């Protein structure tokens, strides 16, 4: 596929359009579904928040994938540093371990201290999810991959350059997030990952008649 960059238009609701166009781009042999903001069933085991933007199941290959879709009019997509997220996990675990050892009697005089600590942990959690790529999504999608061996992806589209990429979440973590001191990922980063065969370019085509984009995404389910 190719794209006519001069003809492509950007709308105020570009993020929603990207999600709709991406879903509609899968072939007829692929079931694609956009789950509601909070998942039920299997998804509820991992989070009360949105796990992903899109699920796709290929009836020929019998493969299911989960995708988190990120779009931007800027030049990069933000993510909180790995060290910050691990610090949250450390503080949370230390408190939970300590709290598990307490009894109703020992907790009584520590009521305010416990309340203050819970508030601190809540703020740390909010901080890890204050970027475009949220920590809880990375963590939960990694758990899905680990427990069910389901491929999970983050897809990025950059409207100004009309370039779109996809990277498996575990590759994003191991080949970028853990080893960078940056607070965002840009096209140069993604191009390098593609060059190293750690991410994918998503070919796309802009259809002027409908003002929609079509993405070549079937291969992600193969």
Residue ranges and their predicted role:
Residues 164-189:
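Short, electropositive alpha-helical surface patch
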Residues 73-93, 119-134:
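Compact nucleic-acid interaction/catalytic patches
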Residues 139-173:
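Nucleic-acid nuclease catalytic cores
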Residues 5, 191-222:
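Charged phosphate-binding loop/patch that engages nucleotide di/tri-phosphates or the phosphate backbone
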Residues 1-50, 58-60, 222:
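Acidic-basic catalytic patches of nuclease active cores, encompassing PD-(D/E)XK
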Residues 54-75, 96, 100-108, 112-119:
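Conserved catalytic cores of phosphodiester-cleaving nucleases, focusing on short active-site segments
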Residues 45-53, 57, 140-142, 148:
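Basic/aromatic recognition patch in beta-strand/loop cores that engages polyanionic ligands
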Residues 49-51, 62-66, 136, 147-149:
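Short connector loops at helix/strand junctions that flank enzyme active sites
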């Amino acid at each position: 596929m190719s794209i006519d960059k001069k003809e492509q238009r950007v709308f105020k609701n570009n993020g929603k359009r990207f999600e709709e166009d991406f879903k509609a781009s899968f072939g007829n042999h692929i079931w694609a579904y956009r789950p509601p903001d909070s998942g039920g069933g299997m998804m509820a085991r991992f989070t009360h928040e949105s796990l992903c933007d899109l699920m796709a199941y290929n009836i020929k290959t019998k493969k299911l994938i989960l995708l988190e879709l990120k779009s931007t009019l800027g030049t990069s997509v933000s993510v909180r540093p790995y060290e910050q997220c691990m610090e949250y996990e450390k503080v949370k675990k230390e408190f939970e371990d300590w709290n598990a050892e307490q009894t109703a009697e020992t907790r009584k005089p520590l009521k305010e201290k416990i309340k203050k600590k819970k508030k601190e942990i809540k703020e740390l959690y909010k901080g890890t999810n204050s970027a475009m790529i949220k920590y809880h999504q990375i963590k939960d999608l990694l758990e899905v991959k680990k427990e069910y061996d389901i491929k999970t992806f983050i897809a990025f589209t950059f409207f100004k350059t009309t370039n779109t990429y996809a990277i498996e979440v575990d590759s994003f973590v191991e080949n970028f997030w853990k080893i960078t001191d940056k607070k965002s990922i840009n096209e140069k980063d993604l191009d390098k990952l593609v060059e190293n065969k750690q991410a994918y370019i998503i070919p796309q085509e802009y259809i002027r008649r409908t003002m929609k984009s079509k993405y070549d995404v079937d291969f992600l389910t193969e």
